[in-house]
Amino acid sequence: MLSFHQLKFNIYQKQLFDNLSITFLDSAITYIKGANGCGKTSLLRMIAGIMQPSNGNIFYKNLNINNIAKPYCTYIGHNLGLKLEMTVFENLKFWSEIYNSVETLDAAIHYFKLYDLLDEKCYTLSSGLQKVVALARLIACQSDLWLLDEVETNLSKENRDLLNNLIVMKANSGGIVLLSSHTENHIKSAQILQLT
């Protein structure tokens, strides 16, 4: 379970949200929607512990996220978290070791069909393939909370379908997935959190 209690966030003297209280139960898929600048990315970054709210608390599994050892979630944002000078395999191995989940590395490579790219330096890949390598972390790094910030950008239809299937599988296994998106909701069973 993930919950916000009276969350408030101001940036550059602009209030993005005030007194935001909501609970996401296990197995939830939620699209965070809203206009540019309404706080979608900021909210995901706060849940990930990268930013702090101006006021209020965020709880995951009934613990304040400030008191949980990191990493407790997998966050993929605009900065994909790739070491561009490293190979695809080195990047995935690096992240799986941080999450103590090396045993899932092969599954990540197989699911996103990365075999032919394993020895490629990430800087040689297109932005779409770099995004796929970052998304492979969802399998390589075992966590029950996924925070995905506009991850469908630059993805082929095939990889978008793989991602959506993976999100549904994560929710079906009890995980929580929050994703911001400017595109149509591809997962019809997902709920919508509209920020204004």
Swiss-Prot record:
The protein's Enzyme Commission number: 7.6.2.5
Keyword field: ATP-binding, Cell inner membrane, Cell membrane, Cytochrome c-type biogenesis, Membrane, Nucleotide-binding, Translocase, Transport
EC class (word): translocase
Main location: membrane
Topology with respect to the bilayer: Peripheral membrane protein
Pfam families in the cross-refs: ABC_tran
Reactions mediated catalytically: heme b(in) + ATP + H2O = heme b(out) + ADP + phosphate + H(+)
Residues covered by the ABC transporter domain: 2-195
Binding positions (ATP): G34, A35, N36, G37, C38, G39, K40, T41
A GO MF term: ATP hydrolysis activity
Gene Ontology cellular-component annotations: plasma membrane
Subcellular locations according to the entry: Cell inner membrane
InterPro entries, per the entry: AAA+_ATPase, ABC_transporter-like_ATP-bd, ABC_transptr_haem_export_CcmA, P-loop_NTPase
PANTHER family, alphabetized: ABC TRANSPORTER I FAMILY MEMBER 1
Subunit structure: The complex is composed of two ATP-binding proteins (CcmA) and two transmembrane proteins (CcmB).
Similarity field: Belongs to the ABC transporter superfamily. CcmA exporter (TC 3.A.1.107) family.
Name assigned to this protein: Cytochrome c biogenesis ATP-binding export protein CcmA
Recorded name of the encoding gene: ccmA
